[in-house]
């Protein structure tokens, strides 16, 4: 019998990510809902290999201020609620603060975002939950997510993904 032990934070994050990100369509759903919550009037979705190797979602919403970008990828980080009382009056599609951290835990993420007030946009890269780069860049108002290599660091999860054709159909249903 194995001894009971507390899991390390990296393992916890990968397990938790599986509850939010089951397949490419989960990412399309979560990021499209974020775009709608950000006031977007246009959302573009592109996928390759059924979303397994590449998903790009671009919107013209309010964007994320540069100083808030790294925090957006932390677990339980949200702009939608502040306290338990807010749960009684939710008017957004998302509010848990789980989507971005979960997506980043199991894929390679590049986000380009710009608010209307900013002169330049921000490019942020995070892979497997580890921050890689944050830099200023030219960008339109809104946010673009590029998700690459879904479940690259959790081979058991990647093995259970459906074929690209099924993944593409599932993503199409979410849009």
Question: What is each model feature region?
Answer:
Residues 1-174:
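N-terminal phosphate-binding caps/lids of nucleotide- and nucleic-acid-binding domains
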């Amino acid at each position: 019998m194995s001894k009971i032990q507390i899991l390390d934070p990296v393992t916890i994050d990968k397990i938790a990510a599986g509850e939010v990100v089951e397949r490419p369509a989960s990412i399309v759903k979560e990021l499209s809902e974020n775009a709608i919550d950000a006031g977007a009037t246009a959302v573009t979705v592109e996928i390759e290999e059924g979303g397994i190797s590449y998903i790009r979602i671009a919107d013209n919403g309010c964007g994320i201020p540069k100083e808030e970008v790294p925090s957006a990828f932390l677990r339980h980080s949200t702009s939608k609620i502040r306290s338990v009382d807010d749960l009684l009056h939710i008017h957004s599609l998302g509010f848990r603060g789980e989507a971005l951290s979960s997506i980043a835990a199991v894929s390679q993420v590049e986000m380009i975002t710009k608010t209307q007030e900013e002169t330049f946009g921000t490019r942020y890269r995070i892979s497997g939950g580890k921050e890689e780069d944050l830099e200023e860049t030219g960008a339109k108002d809104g946010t673009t997510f590029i998700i690459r290599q879904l479940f690259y660091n959790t081979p058991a999860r990647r093995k259970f993904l459906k074929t690209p054709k099924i993944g593409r159909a599932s993503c199409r249903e979410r849009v």
